[in-house]
Amino acid sequence: MIIDLGNHTIECDFDPRIQCNNSAEKLPIEDIGFIYNCVFKQRSATIRSIEATREVYPEAKTYLVSDGGLDYSFLEDERLKFSMQEDTVSPIIKINESNYLDPKNQAVTKKGMAATIRRLKEGLEFCEYPEWFCMTEPDVLIRGKVSHPVEAKLLGHRINFAWYTKSWYDGFIGINNLLSQIEGTIPILRWGSVPVIGHSQTLLKGIEVYEKNFDILDKLSEQFHVPGTFDLFLPILFALAGEPEVFSDEYTECLRNPNWKTSSHPVVHQYREFYSNNDYYGDN
């Protein structure tokens, strides 16, 4: 299939412009581990998020990273491991479409991407390589068992699209030009995977491709201003493994769905009832 994107074309066997790309048949996710990528100072929200997750998946393991924030070691037990690491998020907040090519910002982006891969590897190892993983944050509430379309290796709601602005479009043409140089990859034009729920072995395959082709993929940071945010970076890793993000109707977001409290969605993003005013990155 040839996809026409203005002055560019992309060849693939699916239409990446379509948001709802799933099948009707689903399977339950039972074997899953949780990786909290950055909990910073969201103490109450983190505790509530973990409590909710354990209510649904009591046997699942959790790898918890505090990137320069509070010490959560008091939460450790046989199913939860805590790691205090460097804050790689606050510097990214200051990067935008005007300054992302500055050498110092390039270094920040690359450092953040490397940290995400390291945390994924550490988390999967602690969780004993479950069939599925969930990379998440404290503003995510898992309030029910999650299922996946039979063909899916990565779940999300694909809410973001590359043609949102011309600069985004140009950036994703650059990203996909890099991906096209590597055998077995697919294009990426839609994404929005928060939390990231994916198939562990497929992720590891994508990481392997990324590391083997790092001379090419190190240039991702030069194409777009935020390629390292994990809702985009992980779909890129799955694209390297030949797998698209597949739309899940089990996701909802509090800021987009005023009826989220009474809806049946098991995965809730932007859940901030336990946040306080000093819970955010930046100068706090």
Spans of model-derived segments:
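Short, acidic, metal-binding catalytic loop of nucleotide-sugar glycosyltransferases
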Residues: 51-60
